[in-house]
């Protein structure tokens, strides 16, 4: 793999999509193509307004409409002509859990759901995909986006579980519970440099001030390296 100098670092604003009715009901959305609700549409505009202060030159999105709508709002605010669908950013395939609450999943198979909650490296959603596979494709997607946009700043819109899995891969066990609070409409900033993904900011709700949006730098975070 060819290396790039620091000037070719790509900064990725990884945005969680806005709220949907299923988010409000705390149900697994998975691959269901549910629309943003009124709150989610407002969050999309908030994200677009906040990121309008950043020199974003490209916008990527999960193919699901709730993410694309946020990506479109960001692209319009930045004058970016196209939102690029990226299959690696799509949500976890929850299989039989899709549409259920956590309580319903736990009641159906307590051991399997305990693994999901406590040991994502081993968890596999029944009839769906493993969290390890979801994590691998998310990291691959972010690295691919970073390589394609060396020296630039971009936005990518994905889903709560996918953002959490990316943070877990970079930070490791130091984050504790991998299902940490991640509000809809929030952003987490990553960078890709020399084929590595690093975490720049903690999780923050988007704000117009770029210094506030960047948050506190995590300079010594472990990194996921492209294979």
Where on the chain are the PLM-derived regions?
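Phosphate-coordination/substrate-recognition cap region in phosphate-metabolizing enzymes
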Residues: 2-9, 46-113, 226
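Active-site catalytic microenvironments for nucleophilic, acid-base chemistry
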Residues: 50, 73-77, 144, 148, ...
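Short glycine/proline- and acidic residue-enriched helix-loop micro-motifs
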Residues: 112-133, 222, 227
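GST superfamily/GST-like fold recognition
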Residues: 160-164
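General small-molecule cofactor/ligand-binding pocket signal
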Residues: 13, 84-86, 200
């Amino acid at each position: 793999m060819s290396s790039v100098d620091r000037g070719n670092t790509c900064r990725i604003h990884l945005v969680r999509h806005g709220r949907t009715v299923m988010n409000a009901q705390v149900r697994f959305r998975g691959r269901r193509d549910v629309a943003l609700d009124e709150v989610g549409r407002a969050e999309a505009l908030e994200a677009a307004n906040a990121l309008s202060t950043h020199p974003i030159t490209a916008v990527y999105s999960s193919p699901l409409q709730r993410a694309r709508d946020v990506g479109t709002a960001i692209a319009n605010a930045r004058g970016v002509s196209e939102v690029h669908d990226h299959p690696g950013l799509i949500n976890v395939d929850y299989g039989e859990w899709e549409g259920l609450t956590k309580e319903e999943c736990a009641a159906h198979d307590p051991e399997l759901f305990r693994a999901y909650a406590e040991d994502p490296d081993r968890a596999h959603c029944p009839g769906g995909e493993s969290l390890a596979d979801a994590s691998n494709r998310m990291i691959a997607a972010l690295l691919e986006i970073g390589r394609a946009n060396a020296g630039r700043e971009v936005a990518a819109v994905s889903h709560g579980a996918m953002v959490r899995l990316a943070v877990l891969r970079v930070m490791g066990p130091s984050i504790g519970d991998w299902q940490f609070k991640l509000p809809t409409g929030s952003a987490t900033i990553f960078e890709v440099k020399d084929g590595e993904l690093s975490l720049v900011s903690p999780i923050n709700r988007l704000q117009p001030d770029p210094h506030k949006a960047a948050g506190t730098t995590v300079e010594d975070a472990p990194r996921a390296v492209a294979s």
